[in-house]
Amino acid sequence: MWIPAQIKAREKDMKAMGLQIPTDRIYNETGTALNNAVVLFGRGCTGEIVSPKGLILTNHHCGYGSVQGLTSADKDYFEHGYWANNMNEELPCKGLTITFIRRMENVTDKILTAVSDTMKDDRRDSIITKRIAAVEKEYATATHLDAMIKPYFEGNQYWVAITETFRDVRLVGFPPNGIGAFGGDVENWMWPRHTGDFSIFRVYAGADNRPADYSAANKPYHTEQFFNISIAGYKEGDFTMVYGFPGTTKEYISSYELKEVYAVTDPISIAARTRKLDVWTKHMHDSRDIFLKYTSKRASVANGWKKWQGEVLGLKANDAMGKKLAYEKGFQQWANKDKTAPFANSLLAEMKSATDAADPLIYQEQYNKEAVLGIELIQQGASLERLIACFRSNLTDSARVDTLRKVIAGMAWFYKNYDAATDRDVFISLMQMYFDNCAETMPEYYKTQFAKHEKNINYWAYDVYKRSMASSAEKLNSFAATAKAADSTKILEDPAWQLFDAINTVRQHRIIPALNAYYYQMHYLDRLYMKAQMVKDKSKIFYPDANLTLRLAYGQVKGMKPEGTAKYSFQTNLGEVVALDDPASDIFRVPKKLKDLYKARDYGRWGVNGEMPVAFLASNHTTGGNSGSPVLNARGELIGTNFDRPYEGTMSDYLFDPERCRNISVDIRYILFIIDKFGGAGWLIDENEHCEKVAMNYAFNNCSSPSLMMYKGEAIAFTY
């Protein structure tokens, strides 16, 4: 995950792997390189410009939130998709922004001058915060653009990004969930993968081609920098690059911090969510109504659950702890002898002492969050605080009733997708887990209630859900209808409120302050440890941990062999999609039109030897935030859009191993096929004037026995 300005130093390695263009074509500060075609999509995804008229390609799941604001019962874009027939039909997405990184510059000297390595963080942070504000203002004034400074290498370096954010972004194309979310949670974090995870937007600008608020008078943003599209394909071993905005990685932490992940937080989260998902799955199987209520929530909970399992698997299989300990042994030997970093000698011992003291708190807090606060009724107990606030105000009875009703109406989103009987069974399962593991540290209220209910969690659960007004919207509305000034006691006596208040009091007064002090201490130690590692290995070119800033990763198209005997291909195809079709399943139901196109093998110019590629694997280092990232070939041409990782390699957030870690991308040819043949929006493809020419030139120059591909009687590409 290299900072773009670093890649000049990586050029030899990149070319040895197959790069065919100069690195200054990938990044430069003149505005003529590929970095000017990569955008931060919204607040946490990546997108790529694919036409001179501001057309943006990103993931289906990145556009999901914006499309949700546009869809309705009579315009269900999730079920049917959406394809604009022209620019007039492109739909404004309120609140969605697109940010370009115009250039990046190392400003460490401006931020850290006269700031010592061992200066305590409170004083250090005060100085740095003031300097960042001043330097950002300086760059913004000079460039007439926005400037954002972020820390790198745990605060040992600072870089400024000169950015330009556009506020008028419109939906252009969005495949239905039967394509864009195909496979759902079942295929999430998995390979083989069959999801057409893409969507299309367009950025608009004012008359001066600069950012502007939405206006019907705005024009498509004009740019000379956009990605050429290659439909020539790829083969295993081909060079690839991924450009984007990876969110968070922690590759340089100590073994003590890594142990917290794979031995404490991940296992607890996995165990708690396994229990919750088991209960939800049973109830969803028994009731269609509950299935619909819990589908989205289940996907959200299962997302982390599956990722963490892969993370633990990968860390153990790759002996991540062994590698950390071996490195730390050498580090300590160096620190004992070398005087260039005098602060380094005691770092590992201090880290061990700090983590040893914090581990019991981290253990307890993870159970608090995943087990206790994993129960929806207890979460909802927090919302009762808003009702209590109504009684603290000096309101008349009628005004109080009206205010309570409005507050309760705001909770409708929760009760629309809530089933008390299902949650009661979750309570029984998770509370048993909590008592089995946290009996000594749990709130006293929990112990007394357990004893009061004859130490029978089932009995306790039935009583809680029977008595709590938070278990249904009807109970809350009934309470609000006749609420008097003295009725605040009814809320304070509600079991959901008491369960939440008890755990919240323990967390806020005992656990969170102590953990905040620990994290503050570790931030200081991590910064010094990162500094010492860079001093120790002066010849090594380090890349900083991800922090949602522009990065480039490179690797190769490469299949994988996960645990077991199965050897998977590096590519999937449409035939596999159709083979998975299940009309009774919300996540494996293939749209009829797509099945018809497959049956007729009507792939247009996008198919390859009678097949339609769908997704492929490569060994690029990615993480959250790389969703929607352009995947490029050796010539910097777009061959796909990144959207996921197989769970066997999710440990790459802590240890990247190119032999095990993979990124999953949707093939650009599948994207073009869906746009053209399924969506009937071929006019969008015409905007990328280089698409056909690039494919033909590559095939002609690189294939020993190319054959001509015909489309509508015209030669449009060579295949091989």
Per-range role (PLM):
Residues 1-720:
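Terminal presequence/propeptide segments associated with secretion/organelle targeting
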